[in-house]
Amino acid sequence: TIMEESAEFMEKLNSGAKLPMFTSCCPGWIQHVEKVHPHLMPQVSTCGSPMEMMGALIRNQFKNEDVYSVAIMPCTAKKFEASRPELEKDGKRLVDLVLTTQELGRMIKEAGIDFAKLPDSKPDSPLGDYTGAGVIFGVTGGVTEAVIRRVLGDASPDTLQTIAECGVRGLDGIKAFDVS
């Protein structure tokens, strides 16, 4: 998602498109903008949510296999997102089922699984790799910081530290940045 949103932001910036570019992987927020502020939709990122992108990747990677795709998500609004017609390819949903983390937790408890007693294991390849951008992605302002870091590319560690310290992440106040 960060790679796509960074490229989209740079394209908008370089083409003189109207800014700011709004982004959210929250389907509730997207639906709110669609219904209450439709005039802002041209400024909303066209990138899919991580769930949508993973669903598309799975469908493409395993297109010749009978795969049932399940996403584990923190919010029930993701169930709505998965049911949107835009999240279908060739008449099939990109994600077949969404379980909330609460539902999964209940299932684990009912099955009597004790993670502390399970043997250690490594993530599956090739999708078990992760980046620092993904770590900050899930906090308020994390996507913005990850996009800034990506756009800056090979910036010095001091520059990246300055970005982290300037308060992109967090709930305090409105954040404003000049991009040149």
Predicted features and spans:
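Iron-sulfur-associated redox domains of electron-transfer enzymes in respiratory
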Residues: T1-S180
